[in-house]
Amino acid sequence: MKYNEKKTELSEVGKEVQQFWNDKKIFEKSVETREGNPTFTFYEGPPSANGTPGIHHVMGRTVKDIFCRFKTMQGFQVKRKGGWDTHGLPVELQVEKELGITKEDIGKKITVEQYNQKCREAVMKYKSQWDELTVKMGYWVDLEKPYITFENNYIESVWYLLKEFHQKKLLYKGYTIQPYSPAAGTGLSSHELNQPGTYKDVRDTSAVAQFKLKANPKFADNTYFLAWTTTPWTLPSNSALAVGENIEYVLVSTFNPYTFKPVQVILAKALLGKYFSEKAKDLSLEAYKDGDKLIPFKILQSYKGKDLVGIEYEQLMPYLQPETPAFRVIAGDFVSTEDGTGIVHIAPTFGADDARVAKLAGIPSIVTKDDRGNEYPLVDKRGRFTKEVTDFAGEYVKEAYLTDEEKEAERVKQGRDKYLSVDERISIKLKEANRAFKVEKYEHSYPHCWRTDKPVLYYPLDSWFIKTTAKKERLVELNKTINWKPESTGVGRFGNWLENLVDWNLSRSRYWGTPLPIWRSEDGSEEKCIGSIEELKTEIAKAQKAGIETATDIKDLHRPYVDNIVLVSDSGKPMKRELDLIDVWFDSGAMPYAQWHYPFENKELFNNNYPADFIAEGVDQTRGWFFTLHAISGMLYDKVAFKNVIANGLVLDKNGNKMSKRVGNVVNPFETIDKYGPDATRWYMITNAPPWDNLKFNLDGITEVQRRFFGTLQNTYSFFALYANLDNFTFAEAEIPLAQRTESDRWILSKLQSLVKDVADAYSDYEPTKAGRAIQDFVVDDLSNWYVRLNRKRFWKGEYNADKTAAYQTLYTCLETVAKLGAPIAPFYMDKLFSDLNQVSKKNAVESVHLADFPKVNEAFLDVELEERMSLAQRISSLVHSIRKAQTIKVRQPLSRILIPILQPHLKAQIQAVEDLIKNEVNIKAVEYIEDTSGVVIKTIKPNFKKLGKEYGAKLKEIGNAIAELRAEDITAIERNVFELKLADGTVIPITSEDVEIRSQDIPGWSVASEGGITVALDITLSDDLRKEGIARDVVNRVQNLRKDMGLEVQDKIRITIQKVDELINSALSANQEYICTETQAFSLELVEKLADGKEVEMDEQTLIMKIEK
């Protein structure tokens, strides 16, 4: 059987190999054949199929796939259960948009049952596209039996976990101020509020309001507290003002800048400069006239904040009176003088700090009541003022809540040329009433809903919470045991998040999601948390026995079915389910348990696959899935949910901008894979930058990967296949002992073992970029550009002997090992490479590289000394090539010698051992060694002021002058070792090469290059003999090109005829006739006066006429 020599198209390899995988069930076998082996557990973070996949999903799934494939090849059994995240706000908002309804229409225009059915259908809308991408990119995950979060079994496991929280008294109900999204109609958790991009810079109207003091003998009648707010819409709900007890405040006599009325105002002394010009300090109050540009002011008195506590003031906007006394100054521990006035306006219904300090001080909230006696604030859950706020009743408090049509209608209603927001009109109202001291636009960062992109409100809600604060310290400690990649994300972003943890708001006032399994009596005195379907059946039976009318259908655990189930309390009271759903992030965080329907089934399976050895998702999941996994596992089971995690960075466009359909810079993953192939796409994404860094995705980068890495690897394989087929090499012979192989064989095999170690270590440390780059460097620099190039003649010259067999075996081993090492990153191409080799040699008893074992280091093949000297040969050759390029002297032109300054005997011996190799590689006649470079280089030296300055600051100038005067031999001494620099006062300063900057200038006739401690001087003088030899090498090159153009086989012998040119060329051809014939497989070379049927070939500035005949 022959090795495959067909040209390989990367774009087609994926389809070909995928068909092979399907036909042979390779993925299934990769799991089944490891049965009984140690397990490696991977958790798939469930995507939602209600949106299409993007190029960033290719990145994320490649990272996941790499380590699952690697661990499988290491012998672990790696089950990869796929999953779908099917509940929550994203689905509901999409359905509302498609149906043209809002949340308020559900239950009116459409039943809850119909609505949820639409959600169930919508959530799998793009499943086929996700499945297609999964297959195309080679992501191995079980799509046949995925977990789906809307299925009853999954929900039942979630209920079990919630009951665990409830029994541990970690689940409670509280009436608190929570982030609330009017656009979505539900409260949000703190981790939802901290998703990337939720805080946006906005330009709002801010106002410094004047709160008039009630009659007080210590103050004038026109005295006001100044309090600043960026949310003027909350001012109708003001019921207190907060000061810092130890902050210094001042009473200032001045004039209102809008009404010009005389006022006395109180504010923090430290913030005077924000409102008063220093130039106006000495102006006369009596001389002030309305409209004067500078408003005079005078400080009358100062107070500590604690002296102001208890002072009462008039209600600023008296739309609704509280039932108990309010409107007085209280102390607040959060008050500062960083901005504002040092006095904080307190609206307990719209701020957590406000509610806390108001409660401590006995200050009531400004609330009204509905028909059932339930209290609610002056803004409804759609974000509109209630009827009590008569001037603005029914108006949205945030401009962003209005559509363009609604805004235009409101403008017309206002009778204005331009729409003015509620904040703007409240500010105008205050100005006119002498109740505003300063109104301006203010840019600040404000939280927005992660799904609607609309501003949130801080709103009083009855919500269920998981008491994460009770386990905060333990969650912090457990996090320290997790291997985060990068570490900074675990310590910083995630660690800081845990350090500042607040209780988890679990409640969602929506319809499509996992219902909260808590039933409560109407008075709230009794409740039951249901943890299983069986338990629910038992409780329904109890309710029926107690004579309570209840639904009994529990085929579907969603709303509205569970809403109709009424249970009975222990004391006989009816209990209805709390109507909330739970946070969708709890759904995904429950997947380690719910994917197996634990604890109702698969207990052993769960125990063997918990916690996860590895997970990976985008960095945005730090406060999403990563957190919920960690919180549930840590709080309930005192364990981490995952041991190793990669937090992927963003995939940006090539200019570093976020991809956006609106901008038009989105890269289509399907088109990319179809055009470039999945392997090149994956390899580019992994090797371009570590996965946790942001990737500037550039299609040109994939093209470069195709050319440089896959092109080089394929050419190397094609070279091997061509000659192996000619010689019928099938690896049937016994392995040639290492000691009997050439030094270059032993070197590349040693480098291969070093590569195996480096790649295995990189994969094991979750460093795929290091692994990919190491493989790439080996293939391009060591295997192709060095080993194959230097050993070409062994493959196509001479008889099929032991040396040739060794060359074939060595190159085969390298190719096969590279296929195994690269398989996790480039699964299609590496499987084809492996199969193309193995179908001939039959060396491996498996049909796919993904069923093979990962290579292990063979210590016997490692030779550090050999690797070192070959590395020296490569580095020296590279320096000489760089000089040739700079001097425009081609490699085919021989040169006489190089000089290498060497001070260490071991280093000299190592270079001498590879002298012949260097000479052949860079086309020179001799390598000579010198102990310094003074004969070929002029050196200059100057101090490294940055380094020396840290140690000898005071003496730096003197040291600098002394260094500048050093001689050539002194500079050489510094390069060799530590040099003692003596100053005028006798002080001795040790100087190393790090303390100075040494620069070189070439001497005519020589050219010098240095890199990494190696210096090479090249003699660039050309003698006639060297010129002639260069001409001969050029002729060999042109003959080889003609052979190729004629389609001659490697073994074909030829006759060469060349028309004479000038004396130099004729002499060169005659003197080097034997060399030319040997190199070109020619049995003769003839020079003739005239060649009528020859072919013209260009050679430098000459034209040669030559003919070759078979």
Curated annotation (Swiss-Prot):
Requisite cofactors: Zn(2+)
Protein name in the entry: Isoleucine--tRNA ligase
Keyword presence, Protein biosynthesis: yes
Reactions catalysed: tRNA(Ile) + L-isoleucine + ATP = L-isoleucyl-tRNA(Ile) + AMP + diphosphate
Cystine residue pairs: none
Residues in the signal sequence: none
Family matches, as Gene3D superfamilies: HUPs, Isoleucyl-tRNA Synthetase, Domain 1
E.C. number: 6.1.1.5
Swiss-Prot/TrEMBL keywords: Aminoacyl-tRNA synthetase, ATP-binding, Cytoplasm, Ligase, Metal-binding, Nucleotide-binding, Protein biosynthesis, Zinc
Main location: cytoplasm
Motif extent ('HIGH' region): 47-57
GO BP, one annotated term: isoleucyl-tRNA aminoacylation
Lineage of source species: Bacteria, Pseudomonadati, Bacteroidota, Cytophagia, Cytophagales
Domain notes per entry: IleRS has two distinct active sites: one for aminoacylation and one for editing. The misactivated valine is translocated from the active site to the editing site, which sterically excludes the correctly activated isoleucine. The single editing site contains two valyl binding pockets, one specific for each substrate (Val-AMP or Val-tRNA(Ile)).
Keyword rRNA processing: no
Organism, as annotated: Cytophaga hutchinsonii (strain ATCC 33406 / DSM 1761 / CIP 103989 / NBRC 15051 / NCIMB 9469 / D465)
